[in-house]
Amino acid sequence: MAYTFPSVELSSAPDSADTSKKYELGALGRTETGNMYRYVQVDVSDGVDWAAGHPVYIVYGGDSYECSADLSDAGTSGTGTNAAGIATATVDVSAYTDGTDTVYQWIQVAGSASVTLHSGTDVTNGLHVVWHDDGTVDLMAAGEEHLSMGYCIGGSGTTSLTIQLQGML
């Protein structure tokens, strides 16, 4: 028996946030390029704004599909949490009131994505990356294999990388 995931066909990569829920939380969307996205609620309770290309995580102890760009909201103090996806749009969380306002966004969960590399790091094609701090990724170290967000497929040795996402669906 074949199993297929229900998904939304997107005409292009999403690049904006919604202040009203347009899809079911957790819905998958895909573009004709093969990139896949998941519809989530933005956690507006913290002080870390969302920006395209920044990793996001399921809020520790939060509601299903509520995500944050704040590493401390990911359930640890420092690295050690698996990414839920990559933000596709900017959200100024200070413009919203927690408990009153809701914001929704597609996050990228599969395909190739542009991310920001932590300064001073040299990542070459084929090497895996993990979240380093709010908004940047870093070269995966020994013992962090389970945290890999994907591997570099372009932009080696620069501050901007293209990675092939993995393990986020």
Language-model segments: which ranges?
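Surface-exposed, low-hydrophobicity beta-strand/loop segments enriched in small/polar/acidic residues
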Residues: 1-169
